[in-house]
Amino acid sequence: MNSALNPVAASTAATALTPTSRPLVLGSTSPYRRELLQRLHLPFEVATPDVDETPLPGETPRLLAERLALAKARAVARNFPHAVVIGSDQVADLNGLPLGKPGTHERAVAQLRQMRGQTVVFQTAVAVVCLDSGFEQSSLAAVRVTFRNLTDGEIENYLRAEQPYDCAGSAKSEGLGIALLESIDNDDPTALVGLPLIRTCKMIQAAGVALFADRGEHP
């Protein structure tokens, strides 16, 4: 279901870089990804990626998520060439049909009606880029989510309560949206929220970020 780490650049396929004090940048304006990255207790900056998120003709949800995650990391890295940059993207995959952020109440209603009683795969991709070292890796976490057979009333009341219009699939699993679900199957617990931290940790450490550096915070 989920892929292993997939090196994109040949320079990173053989060996990882020695951890240093490289700055870390999150190439995303998502408050959910920012909150997840804060769990690592690492200093980081946030930058907005300027990327066209329009799907290519015939592009699958998985390929779309992978392409956009890498495009976001590369776009931000151009302004932070010495930093380790994280890019991420998530696309809900309903039987091959990509479902992005609804943006409006009406679209969110339509999405949840489509997904009720169905199993949806949330394709969550993350990419890490450091321009000056040539480091580039990406990985994908595929989260299988089965929705309850929701009534129209439940859908309407949920959306009014949580307004998840900036979330792929029109639900916030970290909030009331968990009540919409029958089951979740994945191997990277934070992937459904938008950033697979297990994969992210592996890649930023390989790129030169010291996850367990002594920060001088002794009792």
Swiss-Prot record:
Q: For this UniProt entry, what's an example GO CC term?
A: cytoplasm
| Class of this enzyme | hydrolase
Highest taxon in the source lineage: Bacteria
Which reactions fall under this protein's catalytic activity?
N(7)-methyl-GTP + H2O = N(7)-methyl-GMP + diphosphate + H(+)
Q: One GO biological process from the UniProt record?
A: nucleotide metabolic process
> In chain numbering, where does the site feature Important for substrate specificity fall?
32, 90, 174
Q: Where in the cell is it found?
A: Cytoplasm
On whether Hydrolase is a keyword of this UniProt record, the answer is yes
Q: Where is the active site?
A: 89
Any one GO MF term held by the record is: nucleoside triphosphate diphosphatase activity
Q: Which InterPro entries match?
A: ITPase-like_fam, Maf-like
Report the family membership: Belongs to the Maf family. YceF subfamily.
- What is the role of the protein in this entry? Nucleoside triphosphate pyrophosphatase that hydrolyzes 7-methyl-GTP (m(7)GTP). May have a dual role in cell division arrest and in preventing the incorporation of modified nucleotides into cellular nucleic acids.
List the PANTHER family.
7-METHYL-GTP PYROPHOSPHATASE, BIFUNCTIONAL DTTP/UTP PYROPHOSPHATASE/METHYLTRANSFERASE PROTEIN-RELATED
The protein, known as: 7-methyl-GTP pyrophosphatase
